[in-house]
Amino acid sequence: MDALVLKKPRGLTKGFFASLSIVLILLGAVGSILESVLLNDDSSPDFLALGAIALLLRALSLASLPIILFLLSEELDRIKNKGRAAALIFILALVAEIPYNLIVGEKIVYTATRSPALAFFLCYIIACLWEREKRLKVPLNIAVALSALWWSAILSIDEGIPCILIFTVCFWLRKKGTLGLFCTSVVLSAVALADPMYTLALPVPALLHFYKE
């Protein structure tokens, strides 16, 4: 009797998506550098072409946000020490501000965040609250999300509101397969209507369909 051969399910691993998001973020950094250079020198004959490239690279970087938020929602159950993870994410978010500020600005510290790193921390905190208080009623869960949106607006966290909206859908529908990705696509479409820079992020839910654990 021939031995049974178990085939591994085909798909794209979290390592692939993590690497893709890093590449997109780096492209966005290049776009920000190019934009900063063009603002200081608008006499270049290729000003319009380079400006369009800078805008395209920044739009591509926004496509990394739904990928990171999706991975965060998927990996949340596997994090054992959530307090330590929260501290690590917060420290990394603060450290990420320094090079970002130097790239797109002239100061090391600004009163408002200039990168979406703190938005990931805020999403992680509300997810921990949802996980810890699983018996919370729907109105209280909504109140947690609304308070996160409020803090995001008060602290002027860059891309904070879109990140919270996208993450909320990813978190609550993370075990729903195609339905979850469809709802994520709907939210992304609404975000893109408000901010056309998110247009290039619209194909991301279709790509996440091939995610495998």
Regions found by a protein language model. Name each.
Residues M1-E213:
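Alpha-helical transmembrane segments and their immediate juxtamembrane cytosolic regions
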